[in-house]
Amino acid sequence: RLIREKLLESQMASEADFLEPQPADDRAVLLVHTEEWVRKLKTGTLTPLDIQRMEVPYSPELVRAVWLSAGGSILAARRALADRVAVNIGGGFHHAFPSHGEGFCVLHDVAIAICKLQADGAIERALTVDLDVHHGNGTAFIFARDESVFTFSMHQEHNYPLEKPPSDLDI
């Protein structure tokens, strides 16, 4: 909400620029995440290790929020195809893995959007450009063997996460 308010206040965006996403459907989420991880999130049956890795407290509201974020990234990707540019200001959870959350990231919204658009035939290939100070370890892991997605991460070397699976290009 704060980002939206600042964008409006600075006149970098108007109310008409904002779209309200719907939560991603489970079929889209399951293109990236395991059935077990989705079940744990939906039923609240996470283990202490699951919660420790996520680094955020579990709640039903959290589950609604991450499904909404994934829906926002799908919507932004579709709008970018139509309008040449779009942003999900509530996304970018690049530490989420298929079978667990990590580093404040529960679902990998960007990977879900890419895989959903590929499954729908809207795109064949994708490029992820990750300029966060932290390496996008979830992104690198998810797309490690997928030649249709090129992963680029520019990050601080000696920072979270400790283990950094290689992206296609790391700087």
Language-model-detected regions and their locations in the chain:
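HDAC/HDAC-like amidohydrolase catalytic core signature
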Residues: 1-171
